Every structure is written in structure tokens, then in C-alpha cells.
């Protein structure tokens, strides 16, 4: 009956809502005009606390439900209890003369008496707050059952008024704790929010859940009551405040409530969130983007849903059009997570992601710069043909001068990928002192292979196949890089780094001016040592009949090919030829002619071609029985291999009898030179054959994926992001660090 009376008198409900802080009106039913708390005492209390409140008298009505004398006595005792406690503990708060606490006042100054009284005033204020806190909690606890019934009422007006009251209660900590301790009330709020078509009710109910979500108990209550699907539904609301409350509540759930991420995914939350990226409120977008990052991190299906709903394009637009740092940071975190997804990467690049991210590399926000660097690093393997990256490349070269390990790792990796098979980018980096900057980065990196390896790869790209390649080759020498580079051949450096270094040395040897410094750095003995070790390892597997395994992503046959190719170029110098010959390498080179790998046959024939220019070496080649395999190689499908073989045969047959020379000549004519006079001339005159090696094509980083990476701390309840672990290396572009994502710590 009491609830029915409240429904029949909306004006009374309104007045109750306005004055609920002091008397809910549900349990007392007192037919009285007495204020719930003495207005004079409360005003004095407010002055002591330095605060002001709007005071109203509370009138409750009991026309339909007469109240017993016992209920009235209970209400009077409850109302007076707080006042008695205040009077007992803080007489100055409720007395008539509290305003005269300090009569002596010098205008604009604090007297000594006032300063002495400050601690007691602070204590009095704390006690008053404690009493009020207890009052709020008791009030909310008494009101909960009745409020739950009102929220479940069939009359939408009653439901709206009840939602308003609960919303007010949820704004105070004590009453808020009472609310989230009632599963029935939270469930009623969720049910009301899900079923209402009234905008005010939707606003109040989402506000209630938003307030509760600031406590772990509240998050659990929302989660258990099925609040996540209801909140996802509210993301379609046309009311901005409802959208804000819904997205912030979901954000808190995603951050702190176990199981929330899966629940949001199952409720199609991603499909609702991605379109919200078209809103224009930066703070709203910052929370929305962080929700996307939390859902996409470590979950490939979520990344694909974001892609299917146009997420990459919208995120790139945000990076391009906004300047709010927190939004740019959260957006860059989403892009960083998506940048390890093979499907999302091309979409981000095609939307102009490289250029948009590059805009922020000079930002004053270190966390934004680092996220942009990681994302660029991860995208760079699919952006080798992108135009308009001139400013990005210049900034990356400048970034090589910093000492931050993450910055150096990203800058070197990105430069390595963007200079892969891109002559324009190679020339630009070379002309902007990129070679010098990379050498200095290598010198500072020490044993950090994740910096040294991509830096060496970038140098390898810059020293071949573009108009400024010779300039780059000379620049390495002029910046004292050769000794440091040769040292990288030492074990126990990782094989990927060793392989990249071998390729760089081969390119440096193309410049005659580099031969002497390379020799002084003892590069030839180191290359021969690596060649012997790699060949022995490869032969062991051949003898055992097992497949050649990868060591850190590198096959030993690749090391054999690289070392032999570098020695081939170095052997063009007479002093180097003599040193290679004296290291007793000819038996090994002859053995390599029998290799089943075509590229190894070619480089072995090439180095023998150079060595055979010296008679002593030519005799040694002949003595090792090289004629037979060389005759076979005359029929090779690789023209370079056949030409090298012919040149060696001509050289070693010079001292043979005429019959032998004639037989060799006939064989060469029939097999190789019948339709190629130029090759005949080349073989006879020992002109070096300069066809490109297999590794002349720039080798970039291969995809390296690892597990989820740590993320940067988010200051507005956003505590996650992605960082990137170490990856392995091999030839090929280096895509992202993780195949899962990054968490930023």
C-alpha cells in the first residue's frame, strides 16, 4: 500500500528524491514537518568543513498507511541519534555560538589563535564526515528493498523517478557501497536500462552503473547481473551522456573484471565500438580506442573484426586529424597491436598509416613517439613501395643519435625494411648521413643484436644497387666502420648477425679503396674460418642423411655461400688473392664445386676464377682435380657458373700439351660459346663476370613473431598496452615483432 501511495503522488516522490540524503521517506513514514537534521546545526557543520549545502525540509506523507506510535518513536529516535552524537563529540558544531569560534580576526591574516585551533577544527571536521558517512550508509540500506520494487514497477514514471533516486545515492561513497552490496538492486538497474525506451531513465541507469564501476565490488555485481550485454546495447544510444557512461563503464570492466573481455566480444561489442571512432569528442575517442586495444590485444579474431568494420582507416584518420595527446597515444596503441596482424598491416599502410604515424615522431610525448616507432617498425616490411616517406626517413636517421634502446631498435629495423629493394629510399638515406648514423649506432649498441643486426642489414642495402652505393661504400671506410664491422664476424655472435655482416663485407669489397682496410682488419682469415666451420656442419648432416637444420633461422649452407662470395670479390685484389691462397683454401673451393646448391657452385667457380690468375694457384687448382667438376659446370643452366668454369679451365690448360688444350677448346665451343661470342672473349681474357649474386637482392627481415608484449601504463584507468620482445632473424623483411602483440609495462 505504501508503494501504491507513492506512485499515486508523483509530486511526493519528487520531493523525496530531492531530500533523500536526510530521510528516504520509505521506512519512517513520519507525518511530520520536522527536518531530518537540524538546519541550524547542519549549516554550522558546513561552515566548519568549509562547504555549503542547499537545505530543504523533508515532509513525508502517510495518508494511506497510518503509522503506529512505535514507528513514530523509532523514527524520532533515529532522527535524533546523529544530532545527539554530534552534540556529544563536537559541541561547537550544533551549538548556537559556533560561528563565534574565533572572535579575533585580522583582515587578510591568520591569527596565532586560529593557527593553534586548526588541528582541532580538522579533527572536528573529520568526525562530522564520519557521522555523515554512517548516516548515508544506513539510509541507503533501509531504502534498497523499496527502491528495487520501484525499479521493477510497470509504471515508467515511477521507474524513472526511482532511477533518479538510485543515481543520486550512487554518487556518495557510503550509499554507493550499500547499493553494490545488493545484487537484486543492481540486477534491477541493469534490467531497467536494457528495457527502457525513456532517455532520462537510460541516462540515470547508465550513470548508476558508471558510478558503481569505480569499485571492484561494483564491477563484479555488474558482471554477474548481465550488465555487459546491456551496456553494449547502450552504445547505440543517440544521447551523448549515455554513450559516455556506457563506454567508460565497459572500459573499467575490460580493465579490471575477469571474463569481461570475452563477454564484450560475445555481445558483439567490437562491432558497436568501431563505428564510434567517427565521433568527434577527443576524450570519448580516447576511452573507445583503449577499449579496442584491450579487446584486440592477443586475440586474432578481434583484430579481424576491427578490420572488417573499417577500423584501420578510422584509426589512421584520428592520427592524422587530432592533436590531443592522450587520444593519439591510445590510438597508436591500437595500431601497434593491429600492426602485427598480417591482414591489418596492408590496410593500415594503404590508409596512409606510415605517413600519419610519421607526423608524430617529433612529438613532445615520449610514450607517443615510442608507440609510433614500434608501429612503423612493424608495418615497414609491407611499406617498402610506399611513397611520401621522405620526412619519415630523415627523422629515423636523426633518431639513431639517441641512446634509448627501444628507439634505436625501432629506427634501425624500420630503416632496414624501408631501404630494402627501394633505390629511392637508399639514395635519400645515404644523402642524409644515414651511413654515418648507422655506424655510430653499431658502435654504441655493444652486444645488443636487436640493434646491431638491423643496422648492418640497412648498411648492406645502402652499399649496393643504387646511384649512391659507391658513396655509401666509401662512407663506411671514412667513418671508421670497417674494423667494427669485421669484429661482428666473431663468434658467439648470432648467426643472423654474422650472415648480415658477411653480405655487408662483400658489398664493401666492391670498392677497391676498401680492400686495404679490410685486409688490415684480418677479414680474410675470419671469413675462411667461418667458411670451414659452416661447411663442416653442413657436411655432417649430409653424411647423416638428415636435412640441413636452421640455426637461429640461418642454414649453414647460406653461410658457406656468403663467405665464398665475399672471398670472390676480395680476391680481385692481388694481395688478397695471395692471402686466400696461402690459407690453403683451394681444396675446399674445389670440393664446393660438387655442391648440390647452384649458388654455392657459382661462387666457388667465381673465387677459383680469380685465384687462377696466379700460376701457382692455377697449378694447385689443377692438382686438386678441379678439371672434372669444372667440365660438368660448363653445362650449368646458370650462365655465370658456366663462364667462371670456362675461365678456370682456360687458365689451368695453358701449360698443358696441345692435345689437352684442343680438347678443352672443343668442349667449351660445343657446350658454352657456340652462340655467345662475348662469353668466349670473357673466358679468354679473364674479364671478371659481374652478374649479381643471389644476395645482391636486398635481404630484409623475415617475419618475426613472439608472444604478447607489455603495454605502457595508461593514466586514465588505462593500464595496458603493447611492447615488443626480441625476434629472430633471417633473410627477408622484418615484419612485426610479435605475432601476438605487445604489452607495455
Swiss-Prot record:
Start and end residues of the ARM repeats are 132-171, 172-215, 216-255, 258-297, 298-341, 342-381, 383-420, 423-464, 470-510, 512-551, 574-613, 615-661
Indicate yes or no for the key word Glycoprotein.
yes
Its primary localisation, in coarse terms, equals other
Q: Which PANTHER family match?
A: ARMADILLO SEGMENT POLARITY PROTEIN
Q: Which residues carry this modification: N-acetylmethionine?
A: 1
**Compartment annotation:** Cell junction, Adherens junction; Cell junction, Desmosome; Cytoplasm, Cytoskeleton; Cell membrane
Spell out the protein name for this chain. Junction plakoglobin
Q: Which PROSITE patterns does the entry mention?
A: ARM_REPEAT
Task: Describe its function.
Answer: Common junctional plaque protein. The membrane-associated plaques are architectural elements in an important strategic position to influence the arrangement and function of both the cytoskeleton and the cells within the tissue. The presence of plakoglobin in both the desmosomes and in the intermediate junctions suggests that it plays a central role in the structure and function of submembranous plaques. Acts as a substrate for VE-PTP and is required by it to stimulate VE-cadherin function in endothelial cells.
Originating organism: Sus scrofa (Pig)
Q: Where is this region: Interaction with DSC1?
A: 574-661
Amino acid at each position: 500500500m505504501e508503494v501504491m501511495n507513492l506512485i499515486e503522488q508523483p509530486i511526493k516522490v519528487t520531493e523525496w528524491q530531492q531530500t533523500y540524503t536526510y530521510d528516504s521517506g520509505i521506512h519512517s513514514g513520519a507525518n511530520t514537518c520536522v527536518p531530518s537534521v537540524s538546519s541550524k546545526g547542519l549549516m554550522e557543520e558546513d561552515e566548519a568543513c568549509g562547504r555549503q549545502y542547499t537545505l530543504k525540509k523533508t515532509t513525508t506523507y502517510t495518508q494511506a498507511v497510518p503509522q503506529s506510535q512505535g514507528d513514530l518513536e523509532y523514527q524520532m529516535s533515529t532522527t535524533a541519534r546523529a544530532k545527539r552524537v554530534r552534540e556529544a563529540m563536537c559541541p561547537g558544531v550544533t551549538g548556537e555560538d559556533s560561528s563565534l569560534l574565533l572572535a579575533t580576526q585580522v583582515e587578510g591574516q591568520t591569527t596565532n589563535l586560529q593557527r593553534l585551533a586548526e588541528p582541532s577544527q580538522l579533527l572536528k571536521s573529520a568526525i562530522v564526515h564520519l557521522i555523515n558517512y554512517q548516516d548515508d550508509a544506513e539510509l541507503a540500506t533501509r531504502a534498497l528493498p523499496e527502491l528495487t520494487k520501484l525499479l521493477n514497477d510497470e509504471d515508467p514514471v515511477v521507474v524513472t523517478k526511482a532511477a533518479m533516486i538510485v543515481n543520486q545515492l550512487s554518487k556518495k561513497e557510503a550509499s554507493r557501497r550499500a547499493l553494490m552490496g545488493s545484487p537484486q538492486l543492481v540486477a534491477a538497474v541493469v534490467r531497467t536500462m536494457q528495457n527502457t525506451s525513456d532517455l532520462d531513465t537510460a541516462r540515470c541507469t547508465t550513470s548508476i552503473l558508471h558510478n558503481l564501476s569505480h569499485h571492484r565490488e561494483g564491477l563484479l555485481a555488474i558482471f554477474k547481473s548481465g550488465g555487459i550485454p546491456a551496456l553494449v546495447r547502450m552504445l547505440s544510444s543517440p544521447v551523448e551522456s549515455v554513450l559516455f557512461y556506457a563506454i567508460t563503464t565497459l572500459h573499467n570492466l575490460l580493465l579490471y573484471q575477469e571474463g569481461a573481455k570475452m563477454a564484450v566480444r560475445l555481445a558483439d561489442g567490437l562491432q558497436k565500438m568501431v563505428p564510434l571512432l567517427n565521433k568527434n569528442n577527443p576524450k570519448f575517442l580516447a576511452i573507445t580506442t583503449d577499449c579496442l586495444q584491450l579487446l584486440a590485444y592477443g586475440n586474432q579474431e578481434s583484430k579481424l573484426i576491427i578490420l572488417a568494420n573499417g577500423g584501420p582507416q578510422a584509426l589512421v584518420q584520428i592520427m592524422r586529424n587530432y592533436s590531443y595527446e592522450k587520444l593519439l597515444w591510445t590510438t597508436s596503441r591500437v595500431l601497434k597491436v593491429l600492426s602485427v596482424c598480417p591482414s591489418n598491416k596492408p590496410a593500415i599502410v594503404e590508409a596512409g598509416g606510415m605517413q600519419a604515424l610519421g607526423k608524430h615522431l617529433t612529438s613532445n610525448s615520449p610514450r607517443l613517439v615510442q608507440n609510433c616507432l614500434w608501429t612503423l617498425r612493424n608495418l615497414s616490411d609491407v611499406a617498402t613501395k610506399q611513397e611520401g616517406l621522405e620526412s619519415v626517413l630523415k627523422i629515423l636517421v636523426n633518431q639513431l643519435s639517441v641512446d634509448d634502446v627501444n628507439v634505436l631498435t625501432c629506427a634501425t629495423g624500420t630503416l632496414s625494411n624501408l631501404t630494402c629493394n627501394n633505390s629511392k629510399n637508399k639514395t635519400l638515406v645515404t644523402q642524409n648521413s644515414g651511413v654515418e648514423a648507422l655506424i655510430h649506432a653499431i658502435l654504441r649498441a655493444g652486444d645488443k643484436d636487436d640493434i646491431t643486426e638491423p643496422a648492418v642489414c640497412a648498411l648492406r642495402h645502402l652499399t649496393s644497387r643504387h646511384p649512391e652505393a659507391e658513396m655509401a661504400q666509401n662512407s663506411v671506410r671514412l667513418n671508421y666502420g670497417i674494423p667494427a664491422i669485421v669484429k661482428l664476424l666473431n663468434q658467439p655472435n648470432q648467426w643472423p648477425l654474422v650472415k648480415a655482416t658477411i653480405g655487408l663485407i662483400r658489398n664493401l669489397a666492391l670498392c677497391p679503396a676498401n680492400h686495404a682496410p679490410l685486409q688490415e682488419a684480418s677479414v680474410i682469415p675470419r671469413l675462411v674460418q667461418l667458411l670451414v666451420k659452416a661447411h663442416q656442419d653442413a657436411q655432417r648432416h649430409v653424411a647423416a642423411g638428415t636435412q640441413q637444420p636452421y640455426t637461429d633461422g640461418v642454414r649453414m649452407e647460406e653461410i658457406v655461400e656468403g663467405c665464398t662470395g665475399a672471398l670472390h670479390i676480395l680476391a680481385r685484389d692481388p694481395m688478397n688473392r695471395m692471402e686466400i691462397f696461402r690459407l690453403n683454401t683451394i681444396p675446399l673451393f674445389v670440393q664446393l664445386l660438387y655442391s648440390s646448391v647452384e649458388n654455392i657452385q657459382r661462387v666457388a667457380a667465381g673465387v677459383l676464377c680469380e685465384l687462377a690468375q696466379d700460376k701457382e694457384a692455377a697449378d694447385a687448382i689443377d692438382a686438386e682435380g678441379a678439371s672434372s667438376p669444372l667440365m660438368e659446370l660448363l653445362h650449368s643452366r646458370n650462365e655465370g657458373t658456366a663462364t667462371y668454369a670456362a675461365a678456370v679451365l682456360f687458365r689451368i690448360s695453358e701449360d698443358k700439351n696441345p692435345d689437352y688444350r684442343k680438347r678443352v677448346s672443343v668442349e667449351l665451343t660445343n657446350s658454352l660459346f657456340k652462340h655467345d661470342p662475348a662469353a668466349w672473349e670473357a673466358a679468354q681474357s679473364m674479364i671478371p663476370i659481374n652478374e649479381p649474386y643471389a644476395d645482391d637482392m636486398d635481404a630484409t627481415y623475415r617475419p618475426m613473431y613472439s608472444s604478447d608484449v607489455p603495454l605502457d601504463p595508461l593514466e586514465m584507468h588505462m593500464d595496458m598496452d603493447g611492447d615488443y620482445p626480441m625476434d629472430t632473424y633471417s633473410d627477408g623483411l622484418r615484419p612485426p615483432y610479435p605475432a601476438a602483440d605487445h604489452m607495455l609495462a
